Amino acid sequence: MAIRIKLKPGRERSLERRHPWIFSNGIHNVNGGKPQAGDTVEVVAHDGHWLGRGAWSPESQIQVRIWTFDKEETIDADFFARRIKRAQAGRDDLIREQGLTGYRLIAAESDGLPGITIDRYANVLVCQLLSTGAEKWRDTIVEQLVLQYPDCAVYERSDVDSRKKEGLVPVVGLLHGELPAMPVIIEENGIKIAVDVVKGHKTGFYLDQRDNRAMAARFVKGKSVLNCFCYTGTFGLYAAKAGAASIENVDVSTLALQTARDNMAINNLNDDHVNYNEADVFKLLRQYRDEGKTFDVIVLDPPKFADNKSQLDGACRGYKDINMIAMQLLNPGGILLTFSCSGLMQSDLFQKVVADAALDAKREVQFIERMHQASDHPISSAFPEGYYLKGLVARVW
């Protein structure tokens, strides 16, 4: 007999809207046995009617992540095969249109596979398995990837803090095939990018900023560009190809800046007009302000400032401060491309924070474009939490 999770009265409403999370405080009782981490359980409303089938996670606040809302759909190898095929089909047009050899194949809940992220970099598939359900089905997931992508190596980068909330330890390593020498070279919009899936951030690279890199290129011809938190310099790379007069790439990582240099080289771009500055962005911006240095275009792509609600107020202060200083460094009519990758930072709140920064900077600001994650990072209508990357293009007077 299947284990049944009965919800408290009224807690079925979010599931009836197909939201895939059930929190521990919404559970009335567990019937039919004691589920182990990752086990598939049936979820029913307080009156007993069936709602969904999901993975049990006893140590997480999110105690069930729903795999399916279809009562006839079983969770087995065919289930994962179908989900992977559907995700690939949904990206095929984009891949052809933009000439992509690097893209997000599986975007977790937004692709109906909670806790599973898979990125493709040429012939390497990089997985992050971040939930007990994903962990339980690890071998099956890898088997299906090998069947559908027989020419690809499969590498795991489940080395993120969120696994701790599930009671899971970090896991990194090769799951199938042979890993090519690093870096892997991917291509997007005719630009080649070096990616180190072993030592790089996340799964190796920030695929979600692809459309925003192209957006930035519209504003840079003949301009001076300051690229903050540049990582491997790809905003600067797009700027160089688009004819920027000068580019300064700033990051704290020596390795990232070396890769930024390599990216220029593999695209046969001269970098005589590019400065690679290993520095703390927060300190450097203040230094440049004190020195009276200015730029025509500034890109602000900082790391996440808020991991939970208790950090949101502090994050707002951090975003306001850094945007204020950046505005003070822009020439009149200059362009600020500013981002937040904190899922808790709603787009309206982010715009308000940047508007407040403009007041403190004593600059007039016009918002001329909104930016978000690339379309291979879809947002399910039932899972608004999947909308995490927000950006604004602002003209600063």
Curated annotation (Swiss-Prot):
One of its GO terms (molecular function) is RNA binding. Keywords: Cytoplasm, Methyltransferase, RNA-binding, rRNA processing, S-adenosyl-L-methionine, Transferase. SMART domains: PUA. InterPro entries: PUA, PUA-like_sf, PUA_sf, RLMI, RlmI-like_PUA, SAM-dep_methyl-trfase, SAM-dependent_MTases_sf. One of its GO terms (cellular component) is cytoplasm. Its EC number is 2.1.1.191. Its main location: cytoplasm. Residues 2-80 form the PUA domain. It comes from the Bacteria. It is found in: Cytoplasm. Pfam families: Methyltrans_SAM (PF10672), PUA_3 (PF17785). It catalyses: cytidine(1962) in 23S rRNA + S-adenosyl-L-methionine = 5-methylcytidine(1962) in 23S rRNA + S-adenosyl-L-homocysteine + H(+). Specifically methylates the cytosine at position 1962 (m5C1962) of 23S rRNA. Belongs to the methyltransferase superfamily. RlmI family. PANTHER family: RIBOSOMAL RNA LARGE SUBUNIT METHYLTRANSFERASE (PTHR42873), S-ADENOSYLMETHIONINE-DEPENDENT METHYLTRANSFERASE DOMAIN-CONTAINING PROTEIN (PTHR42873:SF1). This is Ribosomal RNA large subunit methyltransferase I. The gene is rlmI.
